Amino acid sequence: GLVSNLGI
């Protein structure tokens, strides 16, 4: 997901 892509 988007959060994973940000590394968060």
Curated annotation (Swiss-Prot):
Entry keywords, A to Z: Secreted
Cellular localization per UniProt: Secreted
Cellular compartments per GO CC: extracellular region
Top-rank taxon, per record: Eukaryota
Tissue: Expressed by the skin glands.
Name recorded for this polypeptide: Dynastin-4
